[in-house]
Amino acid sequence: MDSNWINCPSVFSSSSSSSRRCQSRSDLYLGGGYEDLEGEDDLKAEFICPFCAEDFDIVGLCCHIDEEHPVEAKNGVCPVCTKRVGLDIVGHITTQHANFFKVQRRRRLRRGGYSSTYLALKKELREANLQSLLGGSSSFTSSTNIDSDPLLSSFMFNSPSVNQSANKSATPVTVGNAATKVSIKESLKRDIQEAPLSGEDQEKAKKSEFVRGLLLSTMLEDDF
């Protein structure tokens, strides 16, 4: 029990030192600081771990060896130059093959630069298309935008005339409808007047004419 507790600090210290080494590899990879070498683009991008035969890039390989094979790394074959290293494989790679870190960093920056440039161009193209659809700016109804867009200007200036012509065409229709209604009413009255009357209706008509005649004669006598 005591021996386990005694060995625990060494385990923690080895784990923390491994993390620090991995962080230093990442800092080395991100920071660069190496001179450009001729033919560096032709160098391999991935390497095989000499202990588990997995593929990694140069930084991933160093971190993998630090974390997964800290004991075996003290004596093994360098995956870059295939030479046997008796002390520290990761230290050998970072010192003797530092140009691979520079190549890896440059490739990463190239990929990031391409993607950022592509996104910027795509954004500009989208904004240009949107601007052309809206007439060039948010205040697309201004005189400048109307003059620059003949289709929009024709629509803006011709719309009142279209409305006026529509109103003019609607007015005769209304007058014609009223005249048609008047003619229909007159024809109905004419039909009623010309229709044959029954006996009772004829008697009523005679009585009404007699009463009307009396009233007219009375009014004429009063005037004289």
From Swiss-Prot:
Keywords, comma-separated and alphabetical: Cytoplasm, Phosphoprotein
Compositionally biased intervals (Low complexity): 13-23
Cellular location(s): Cytoplasm, Perinuclear region
Post-translational modification: Phosphorylated in vitro by CPK3 or CPK11.
Residue stretches of biased makeup (Polar residues): 1-12
Disordered: annotated span: 1-23
Pfam families registered for this protein in UniProt: Di19_C, zf-Di19
Keyword GTP-binding in annotation: no
The keyword Secreted appears for this protein: no
GO CC terms, sorted: perinuclear region of cytoplasm
Induction cue: By salt stress, but not by abscisic acid.
Domain of life the protein comes from: Eukaryota
Modified positions (Phosphothreonine) in chain numbering: 117
Expressed in which tissues: Expressed in seedlings, roots, leaves, stems, flowers and siliques.
PANTHER family reported for this sequence: PROTEIN DEHYDRATION-INDUCED 19 (PTHR31875), PROTEIN DEHYDRATION-INDUCED 19 HOMOLOG 4 (PTHR31875:SF23)
Family per record: Belongs to the Di19 family.
Protein's name in the database: Protein DEHYDRATION-INDUCED 19 homolog 4
Gene designation: DI19-4
